[in-house]
Amino acid sequence: MQARYSVSSPNSLGVVPYLSGEQSYYRAAAAAAAAGGGYTGMAAPMSMYSHPAHEQYQAGMARAYGPYTPQPQPKDMVKPPYSYIALITMAIQNAPEKKITLNGIYQFIMERFPFYRDNKQGWQNSIRHNLSLNECFVKVPRDDKKPGKGSYWTLDPDSYNMFENGSFLRRRRRFKKKDVVKDATKEDKDRLLKEHHGSQPAAAQQQRQQQQGQAQAEQDSGSQPVRIQDIKTENGTSSPPQAMSPALSTVPKIESPDSSSSMSSGSPHSIPSNRSMSLEAAESHHPHQQHHHSQGFSVDNIMTSLRGSPQGSGELPSPLISSSRTGIAPSSLLTYSPGQGSIYSPPCSQGTSSGGGAGTYHCNMQAMSLYSGDRSGHLTPANTPAATTVEDTLPDYSITTTTTSALSHGNQEHPHQGRLPSWYLNQAGDLGHLAGATYPGQQQNFHSVREMFESQRLGLNSSPVNGNSSCQMSFPPSQSLYRTSGAFVYDCSKF
């Protein structure tokens, strides 16, 4: 009887022997060690607690463990390793017509697995839940020919491959009817898509490509700016654009002369294409209006002045005409427009064919009318052939009070002296018949500007070159773009 009670059984189960009043915990432990012989190391120290009635305690302890000994459970009482879905599927597939009632499912499970016979854990309720909640089981109404109770249950045709390799121990996935519908729909869509792509004619693709090409071409043509070369007439003069509003503002290019001096004279195709043409459109359609000097002399009064379109410019070279004309913006920066050839080729040269044409550098100021009467004596007389030639060939750039050609262009209330600084080109010898240009950059009162003009007039008289061929420039003290010395009058012939 001692062989049935090993030491591992009470220790593994965590069972403490029942202790009476005469027993102690150590005597019980010693009895357990002596019974199994497992705790040999503890037998010697536990012997000191031994009692004369040791044998009877040992026998009593063995009898005390008798009722709690786990009996070997028969195989029929072990729960089968199948899910309720697998059990129901077994019952349905075992039926001759592949359909069975709920009572038939119960009978099949109890006959096949005896565990469910005596077990009252509510497995029948679990069977009913699985039948209702799983879409793989379909309820079939009972026929009138077969009287009875309850409806039949069968498997969905798409759920026969629900278990892997026919093994009810492993199920692939939870069966859902919508997944089957999705799979079928996806297959149909793929098949239709392949057929559609295969039957699509090549002409439709070509038509689509042509439409895309046309849209791209329209986009490119819409974004391309208007260039001066595209609007030239047969005689070389540039005709102003017709569909542009005169209210558009001209954006002049602002650079220092040093950075632009690296540009060499080239072909007429070197004109910047971002040049605004609204200035020329405005001068061909609207005579501009001049501000009067009653409000005092300021930068606002020397805004960009529009000149008349060159009507009699047949003798003028096309590079001079095609170059853009800008004025002084209401800021302290000097603006210039690079032309086709070298950047600062002057229109103040007597022969207009010098250098193959060039850009212009204008500062058209309305304040020039303040001393135009005083300076008319220093200019070349209007009745000389040289003055007439210059004024005829340069109707836009040199307009004086002694000529009638300025009035023929019909839009100047006050004359302007458009000047080009010749010292950028080192061509002081070719200058003539033009007056100097002043560049006031900040707002000054009337008296200071008048004094500056007087000093320039005196500088013209005392120039080492005669007044007709000298080009003078007067800079205000605040103009730090070129030089910062105290002298305000520079002789262009030095450079």
UniProtKB/Swiss-Prot annotation:
Region of interest called Disordered, as start-end residue ranges on this chain: 175-322
Compositionally biased spans, kind Basic and acidic residues: 178-198
Superkingdom field: Eukaryota
UniProt DNA-binding residue ranges: 79-173
Biased amino acid composition, Low complexity: 199-224, 257-276
GO molecular function: chromatin binding; DNA binding; DNA-binding transcription factor activity; transcription cis-regulatory region binding
Record's subcellular location: Nucleus
Keyword Plastid: no
SMART domains on file: FH
Pfam families: Forkhead
Record's GO cellular component terms: nucleus
Gene3D superfamilies, A to Z: Winged helix-like DNA-binding domain superfamily/Winged helix DNA-binding domain
One GO term of the biological process aspect: cartilage development
Keywords linked to the UniProt accession: Developmental protein, DNA-binding, Nucleus, Transcription, Transcription regulation
Stretches with biased composition (Polar residues): 296-312
Keyword Transcription regulation: yes
Role description: DNA-binding transcriptional factor that plays a role in a broad range of cellular and developmental processes such as eye, bones, cardiovascular, kidney and skin development. Acts either as a transcriptional activator or repressor. Binds to the consensus binding site 5'-[G/C][A/T]AAA[T/C]AA[A/C]-3' in promoter of target genes. Upon DNA-binding, promotes DNA bending. Required for cell viability and resistance to oxidative stress in the eye. Promotes cell growth inhibition by stopping the cell cycle in the G1 phase through TGFB1-mediated signals.
Subunit relationships: Monomer.
Entry protein name: Forkhead box protein C1
